[in-house]
Amino acid sequence: MSEPMTSDDLEDFGTEIADQVTSFLMAVRAVARGDAPDSYVPILLLEISQLLLGGGRLGAIRDVVPDERFESDAGPDPDLDELREKLAALLKPVNTYKEVFDPLATKSEIETRRISDDLALICADLAHGLAHHRDGRITEALWWWQFSYLSSWGPAASAVMRALQSIVARSRLDPTR
């Protein structure tokens, strides 16, 4: 783990993560709108990979401890049903994939997942932290992004990245598919 960050370091780091989050959310929304009909899978792969770089940075720093014991209200959660539905329609031929739930467990479970559901979950977690950041609660935003990276959006993003990479690899290595 790294040394503790100063408040200035945390603010700079929070801005960097917020920029990555904003970029990811904008790209996913653009894909869902149909802005890249011929390249949506490679674009999503690139965006999820970039996001995981930020997640790795969050995982590498010491635990961020919020100023308050209880999380401040970040406002209503975004309604991502339309985004999920548009992504599901776009990804229909490749949306469903299999994932090993916990590869370190002695008895691994294989789950059936949907890329569209996982992307919507990731967007919800990221938007929640972004609401804190926009309200000036930098430590709270970083705490949320770090906690949810480790517990929710990080595992989902890793699974989606593997699924998207598999789709890209199959399309390039086996052109008959």
Segments the model singles out, each with a brief description of its role:
Residues S2-M5, A18-G75:
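N-terminal interaction modules that seed assembly of large macromolecular complexes
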Residues P4, I110-R113, L121-R177:
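Acidic, proline/glycine-rich low-complexity IDRs
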Residues D9-F13, I110-I115:
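A ubiquitous short alpha-helical element
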Residues E16-S23, A27, I43-R57, E82, ...:
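Charged, amphipathic alpha-helical oligomerization/scaffolding segments
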Residues V31, D35, L58, V94-K98, ...:
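Short secondary-structure junctions and interdomain/linker hinges
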Residues P37-Y40, P76, I115, I138-L142:
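Residue-level recognition of alpha-helical structural elements
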Residues A60-P103:
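Heme-based O2/NO sensor domains and their adjacent alpha-helical segments
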Residues K98-I110, D135:
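Short, charged/polar, low-complexity loop and linker segments
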